[in-house]
Amino acid sequence: MSTQWYPHENAAASAAALADAVAETLQDALDKKGQAVLAVSGGRSPIAFFDALSQKDLDWQHIGITLVDERIVPTDHADSNTGLVREYLLKNKAAAAHWIPMVADGADEAALADSEKAVAFALQHYRQPDALVLGMGGDGHTASLFPQAPQLDKGLDPAYAEPLLHTSPVTAPHERISMTLEAVAATPAVFLAIQGAEKKAVYEAAAAQASKTYPLSFVLNHKKVTCHVYYAN
Protein backbone atom coordinates (compact mmCIF):
# COMPACT_ATOMS: atom_id res chain seq x y z
CA MET A 1 0.00 0.00 0.00
CA SER A 2 1.29 3.41 -0.94
CA THR A 3 0.19 6.66 -2.51
CA GLN A 4 1.98 9.22 -4.63
CA TRP A 5 0.64 12.78 -4.33
CA TYR A 6 0.73 15.18 -7.30
CA PRO A 7 -0.67 18.62 -6.32
CA HIS A 8 -1.56 21.27 -8.91
CA GLU A 9 -2.74 24.85 -8.67
CA ASN A 10 -5.85 24.33 -10.78
CA ALA A 11 -7.97 21.72 -12.51
CA ALA A 12 -6.54 22.39 -15.98
CA ALA A 13 -2.97 21.79 -14.84
CA SER A 14 -3.96 18.63 -12.98
CA ALA A 15 -5.89 17.27 -15.99
CA ALA A 16 -2.94 17.92 -18.31
CA ALA A 17 -0.48 16.23 -15.95
CA LEU A 18 -2.79 13.25 -15.49
CA ALA A 19 -3.16 12.90 -19.26
CA ASP A 20 0.63 12.89 -19.60
CA ALA A 21 1.00 10.19 -16.95
CA VAL A 22 -1.77 7.98 -18.34
CA ALA A 23 -0.41 8.32 -21.89
CA GLU A 24 3.03 7.25 -20.65
CA THR A 25 1.51 4.23 -18.91
CA LEU A 26 -0.40 3.21 -22.04
CA GLN A 27 2.73 3.61 -24.15
CA ASP A 28 4.63 1.33 -21.76
CA ALA A 29 1.93 -1.34 -22.13
CA LEU A 30 1.99 -0.97 -25.92
CA ASP A 31 5.78 -1.34 -25.93
CA LYS A 32 5.62 -4.49 -23.80
CA LYS A 33 2.71 -6.36 -25.38
CA GLY A 34 1.43 -4.42 -28.37
CA GLN A 35 -1.89 -3.50 -26.81
CA ALA A 36 -3.30 -1.66 -23.80
CA VAL A 37 -6.58 -1.21 -21.93
CA LEU A 38 -7.62 1.92 -20.02
CA ALA A 39 -10.63 2.13 -17.69
CA VAL A 40 -12.00 5.57 -16.88
CA SER A 41 -14.64 7.03 -14.59
CA GLY A 42 -17.60 9.16 -15.60
CA GLY A 43 -19.08 12.39 -14.30
CA ARG A 44 -18.22 15.93 -15.33
CA SER A 45 -14.87 16.14 -13.55
CA PRO A 46 -12.81 14.10 -16.07
CA ILE A 47 -13.83 16.08 -19.18
CA ALA A 48 -10.67 18.21 -19.34
CA PHE A 49 -8.56 15.09 -18.78
CA PHE A 50 -10.44 13.27 -21.56
CA ASP A 51 -9.84 16.12 -23.98
CA ALA A 52 -6.12 16.27 -23.19
CA LEU A 53 -5.68 12.51 -23.46
CA SER A 54 -7.58 12.33 -26.75
CA GLN A 55 -4.88 14.44 -28.40
CA LYS A 56 -1.93 12.24 -27.42
CA ASP A 57 0.17 10.56 -30.09
CA LEU A 58 -0.48 6.92 -29.24
CA ASP A 59 -1.21 3.82 -31.31
CA TRP A 60 -4.89 4.20 -30.44
CA GLN A 61 -6.06 1.38 -32.72
CA HIS A 62 -4.38 -1.02 -30.29
CA ILE A 63 -5.85 0.61 -27.17
CA GLY A 64 -9.13 -0.46 -25.61
CA ILE A 65 -11.16 2.04 -23.58
CA THR A 66 -13.69 0.91 -21.00
CA LEU A 67 -15.33 2.12 -17.80
CA VAL A 68 -14.59 1.65 -14.12
CA ASP A 69 -18.35 1.73 -13.54
CA GLU A 70 -21.56 2.48 -15.41
CA ARG A 71 -25.17 3.34 -14.68
CA ILE A 72 -27.51 0.63 -15.97
CA VAL A 73 -29.30 2.96 -18.36
CA PRO A 74 -29.50 3.11 -22.17
CA THR A 75 -26.27 4.37 -23.68
CA ASP A 76 -28.09 7.41 -25.10
CA HIS A 77 -29.42 8.36 -21.63
CA ALA A 78 -28.20 11.69 -20.24
CA ASP A 79 -26.67 9.89 -17.23
CA SER A 80 -24.78 7.28 -19.26
CA ASN A 81 -21.02 7.25 -18.74
CA THR A 82 -20.73 5.56 -22.13
CA GLY A 83 -22.18 8.60 -23.85
CA LEU A 84 -19.89 10.91 -21.90
CA VAL A 85 -16.75 9.00 -22.87
CA ARG A 86 -17.80 8.80 -26.50
CA GLU A 87 -18.36 12.56 -26.62
CA TYR A 88 -15.27 13.74 -24.77
CA LEU A 89 -12.60 11.01 -25.04
CA LEU A 90 -13.25 8.96 -28.19
CA LYS A 91 -12.45 11.90 -30.46
CA ASN A 92 -9.39 13.51 -32.04
CA LYS A 93 -6.61 10.91 -32.20
CA ALA A 94 -8.38 8.70 -29.64
CA ALA A 95 -11.27 8.19 -32.07
CA ALA A 96 -9.33 5.17 -33.33
CA ALA A 97 -9.46 3.42 -29.94
CA HIS A 98 -11.52 0.26 -29.43
CA TRP A 99 -14.55 0.72 -27.17
CA ILE A 100 -15.12 -2.08 -24.62
CA PRO A 101 -18.77 -1.79 -23.57
CA MET A 102 -20.38 -2.24 -20.19
CA VAL A 103 -23.94 -1.71 -21.45
CA ALA A 104 -25.16 -2.88 -24.85
CA ASP A 105 -25.94 -0.22 -27.43
CA GLY A 106 -29.63 -0.24 -28.29
CA ALA A 107 -30.73 -1.84 -25.02
CA ASP A 108 -33.73 0.09 -23.69
CA GLU A 109 -34.86 0.45 -20.08
CA ALA A 110 -37.04 -2.65 -20.31
CA ALA A 111 -34.12 -4.73 -21.58
CA LEU A 112 -31.93 -3.39 -18.78
CA ALA A 113 -34.45 -4.03 -16.00
CA ASP A 114 -32.69 -7.29 -15.11
CA SER A 115 -29.49 -5.96 -13.56
CA GLU A 116 -27.82 -9.36 -13.37
CA LYS A 117 -28.27 -9.86 -17.12
CA ALA A 118 -26.73 -6.44 -17.64
CA VAL A 119 -23.73 -7.46 -15.55
CA ALA A 120 -23.44 -10.72 -17.51
CA PHE A 121 -23.16 -8.69 -20.73
CA ALA A 122 -20.42 -6.54 -19.20
CA LEU A 123 -18.52 -9.60 -18.00
CA GLN A 124 -18.57 -11.11 -21.49
CA HIS A 125 -16.69 -8.07 -22.77
CA TYR A 126 -14.46 -7.38 -19.76
CA ARG A 127 -10.73 -6.98 -20.24
CA GLN A 128 -8.38 -6.37 -17.34
CA PRO A 129 -7.10 -2.79 -17.56
CA ASP A 130 -3.45 -1.83 -17.65
CA ALA A 131 -4.40 1.52 -16.16
CA LEU A 132 -7.48 3.01 -14.60
CA VAL A 133 -8.53 6.44 -13.43
CA LEU A 134 -10.74 6.63 -10.38
CA GLY A 135 -12.76 9.52 -9.04
CA MET A 136 -14.09 10.03 -5.54
CA GLY A 137 -17.42 11.34 -4.34
CA GLY A 138 -17.81 13.58 -1.33
CA ASP A 139 -19.14 10.52 0.51
CA GLY A 140 -15.91 8.60 -0.11
CA HIS A 141 -17.29 6.31 -2.81
CA THR A 142 -15.18 5.31 -5.77
CA ALA A 143 -16.26 3.44 -8.89
CA SER A 144 -19.82 2.49 -7.86
CA LEU A 145 -18.74 1.13 -4.49
CA PHE A 146 -20.97 3.30 -2.33
CA PRO A 147 -21.28 3.47 1.45
CA GLN A 148 -24.44 1.68 2.60
CA ALA A 149 -24.95 -0.09 -0.73
CA PRO A 150 -26.19 -3.63 0.00
CA GLN A 151 -23.55 -5.10 -2.32
CA LEU A 152 -20.61 -3.20 -0.78
CA ASP A 153 -19.31 -6.18 1.19
CA LYS A 154 -19.32 -8.32 -1.96
CA GLY A 155 -17.51 -5.63 -3.91
CA LEU A 156 -14.79 -5.44 -1.25
CA ASP A 157 -14.49 -9.21 -0.73
CA PRO A 158 -11.13 -10.55 -1.98
CA ALA A 159 -12.75 -13.96 -2.43
CA TYR A 160 -15.39 -12.66 -4.87
CA ALA A 161 -14.40 -14.23 -8.17
CA GLU A 162 -15.82 -11.83 -10.75
CA PRO A 163 -14.21 -8.48 -11.63
CA LEU A 164 -17.60 -6.72 -11.98
CA LEU A 165 -20.77 -6.66 -9.92
CA HIS A 166 -24.18 -5.01 -9.71
CA THR A 167 -24.54 -2.30 -7.06
CA SER A 168 -27.57 -0.38 -5.79
CA PRO A 169 -26.52 2.98 -4.32
CA VAL A 170 -28.70 4.22 -1.48
CA THR A 171 -27.55 7.81 -1.97
CA ALA A 172 -27.41 8.09 -5.78
CA PRO A 173 -29.73 7.30 -8.70
CA HIS A 174 -29.66 4.26 -10.97
CA GLU A 175 -28.56 0.68 -10.57
CA ARG A 176 -24.88 0.31 -11.41
CA ILE A 177 -22.18 -2.01 -12.72
CA SER A 178 -18.86 -1.57 -10.96
CA MET A 179 -15.38 -2.99 -10.91
CA THR A 180 -14.66 -4.75 -7.64
CA LEU A 181 -11.87 -3.83 -5.24
CA GLU A 182 -9.79 -6.81 -6.37
CA ALA A 183 -10.20 -5.91 -10.04
CA VAL A 184 -8.95 -2.41 -9.24
CA ALA A 185 -6.06 -3.85 -7.23
CA ALA A 186 -5.11 -6.15 -10.12
CA THR A 187 -4.58 -3.11 -12.36
CA PRO A 188 -0.88 -2.23 -12.65
CA ALA A 189 -1.39 1.55 -12.72
CA VAL A 190 -4.08 3.14 -10.54
CA PHE A 191 -4.74 6.88 -10.75
CA LEU A 192 -7.11 9.01 -8.66
CA ALA A 193 -8.25 12.52 -9.59
CA ILE A 194 -9.72 14.83 -6.93
CA GLN A 195 -10.29 18.56 -6.60
CA GLY A 196 -10.91 21.00 -3.77
CA ALA A 197 -10.36 21.21 -0.03
CA GLU A 198 -13.54 19.31 0.83
CA LYS A 199 -12.55 16.25 -1.18
CA LYS A 200 -8.98 16.51 0.08
CA ALA A 201 -10.29 16.17 3.64
CA VAL A 202 -12.33 13.08 2.68
CA TYR A 203 -9.30 11.63 0.89
CA GLU A 204 -7.11 12.14 3.97
CA ALA A 205 -9.67 10.39 6.18
CA ALA A 206 -9.88 7.52 3.69
CA ALA A 207 -6.10 7.21 3.44
CA ALA A 208 -5.75 6.97 7.22
CA GLN A 209 -7.39 3.54 7.51
CA ALA A 210 -9.73 1.17 5.68
CA SER A 211 -13.33 1.81 6.67
CA LYS A 212 -16.67 1.14 4.98
CA THR A 213 -17.54 4.75 5.76
CA TYR A 214 -15.24 5.61 2.84
CA PRO A 215 -15.06 2.75 0.31
CA LEU A 216 -12.12 4.44 -1.43
CA SER A 217 -10.14 3.70 1.73
CA PHE A 218 -9.91 0.04 0.74
CA VAL A 219 -8.12 1.01 -2.48
CA LEU A 220 -5.78 3.42 -0.73
CA ASN A 221 -4.92 0.88 1.96
CA HIS A 222 -4.70 -2.21 -0.29
CA LYS A 223 -1.35 -3.97 -0.04
CA LYS A 224 -1.09 -4.39 -3.83
CA VAL A 225 -1.98 -0.84 -4.82
CA THR A 226 0.16 2.21 -5.42
CA CYS A 227 -2.34 4.99 -6.05
CA HIS A 228 -1.15 8.04 -8.00
CA VAL A 229 -3.28 10.92 -6.74
CA TYR A 230 -3.70 14.01 -8.92
CA TYR A 231 -5.05 16.85 -6.80
CA ALA A 232 -6.23 20.28 -7.95
CA ASN A 233 -6.87 23.17 -5.57
Regions found by a protein language model. Give the residues of each.
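Glycine-rich N-terminal segment of FAD-binding domains in flavoprotein oxidoreductases
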Residues: 31-54
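Ligand-binding beta-strand-loop-alpha-helix segment within the catalytic cores
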Residues: 2, 61-133
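A glycine- and small-aliphatic-rich helix-loop capping segment at beta-alpha/alpha-beta transitions
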Residues: 52-60, 86, 147-156, 208
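Glycine-rich beta-strand-to-loop/alpha-helix junction loops that act as flexible
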Residues: 40-45, 134-138, 195
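N-terminal glycine-/serine-/threonine-rich phosphate-binding loop
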Residues: 1-38
